[in-house]
């Protein structure tokens, strides 16, 4: 976990109804638009878009790769465009968290985080073993699938009400908050996960190990 000088994201209230976005909605699920996950686009993108008829500020999103080698090759393409490596690549949780994080090895993954010039984070992950949870996700949804998108909000509880009205249900009894971030996974009937993330004033940590462990465990609890 690193504490970064992330930019404060503010909405452009004049954002057009149709904007270029890395995401495509299909039958309730999100997929990546291959035209807009290239470094030339993501390093100039504002991290604002529309999702499920809601204008949102994206804190981070996850791109999943078949292997760590492919993850690293993709990351290298960003270096000439001003993106910064802020974490990884390494194995989560054992090489990320100083405290003992007790999650089954089925939920471990290779992880890397890139900071874009606009202040948004692009998280890259890959299975750590054949047949693990991340590998099964890829086989079920395909490599274009979006595992989750994290929407930055001012108040997680208030935002959760908005998204529950869009038929996204919380995947755990409460939001996770171990002191640095407040985060909550919600999922719609199609199986798409969105994350609501509230960054506490003065804290711009990339993630909280206990929170992430809780989020990962919530995926197998539903």
Feature map (PLM): residue ranges:
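Glyoxalase I/VOC metalloenzyme domain signal
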Residues: 1-87, 101-171, 180-222
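Solvent-exposed serine/threonine-rich low-complexity stretches and specific carbohydrate-binding patches
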Residues: 89-91
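Long, acidic/serine-threonine-rich intrinsically disordered regions with weak helical/coil propensity
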Residues: 93-100
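A short beta-turn/loop motif at secondary-structure boundaries
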Residues: 176-178
